[in-house]
């Protein structure tokens, strides 16, 4: 039985729903993967792995800077619904005690809303992402039209509900 089958997963990853503006959002930053081949071109929320002894929020800021060259201001966490939540394992890292979204390969993912630290910053593709797109939030089904990684679909649905769209 895998970790995800038991309701627990091991490694924590973090991602951000980067909005153009947290107060009055009109667009969301969506990142198309470069690899592996079976996921190339599929979209995800940008982020990455939390290193040992690193707080999730610190990891997210570091990963966004490294992966897409974007400094952000974090907003609230997008809380996972209880029926989808994956519990933190015993001996988890600092700040890693919250339930998380199930992610690919048995990882657990926590997601925060965010906005660019410097208005007008757009980020850059490269490395893990072949392209970045700022997608309009209206109409709400526009986000669902993108070819998302399967694990990100429930997160996108919860995000749209959170925005009340």
Model regions: which residues?
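Short, low-complexity, intrinsically disordered N-terminal peptides in bacterial proteins
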Residues: 1-10, 22-24, 91-97, 101, ...
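Conserved N-terminal beta-strand and adjoining loop/helix that marks the start
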Residues: 2-28, 49, 80
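Active-site-adjacent beta-strand/loop module that shapes the phosphate/pyrophosphate-binding cleft
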Residues: 11, 82-122, 128, 133-140, ...
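Residue-level signal for short segments within beta-strands and strand-turn junctions
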Residues: 18-20, 32, 115-116
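Conserved Nudix-box catalytic region and its N-terminal flanking loop in Nudix hydrolases
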Residues: 24-67
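A generic structural signal for short hydrophobic patches within well-formed alpha-helices
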Residues: 50, 140-143, 156
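A short coil-to-beta-strand element that immediately follows conserved catalytic motifs
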Residues: 71-81
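Charged phosphate-binding loop/patch that engages nucleotide di/tri-phosphates or the phosphate backbone
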Residues: 145-165
């Amino acid at each position: 039985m895998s970790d995800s089958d038991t309701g627990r997963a091991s490694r924590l990853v973090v991602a951000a729903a980067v909005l153009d503006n947290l107060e009055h959002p009109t667009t969301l930053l969506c990142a198309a993967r470069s690899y592996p081949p079976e996921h190339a071109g599929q979209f995800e929320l940008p982020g990455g792995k939390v290193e040992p002894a690193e707080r999730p929020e610190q990891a997210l800021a570091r990963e966004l800077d490294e992966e897409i060259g974007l400094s952000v201001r974090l907003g609230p966490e997008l809380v996972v619904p209880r029926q989808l939540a994956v519990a933190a394992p015993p001996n988890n890292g600092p700040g890693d005690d919250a339930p998380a979204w199930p992610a690919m390969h048995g990882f657990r993912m926590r997601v925060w809303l965010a906005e660019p630290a410097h208005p007008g910053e757009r980020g850059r593709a490269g490395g893990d992402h072949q392209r970045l797109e700022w997608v309009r939030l209206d109409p709400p089904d526009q986000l669902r039209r993108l070819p998302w990684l399967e694990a990100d679909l429930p997160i996108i649905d919860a995000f749209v509900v959170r925005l009340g769209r």
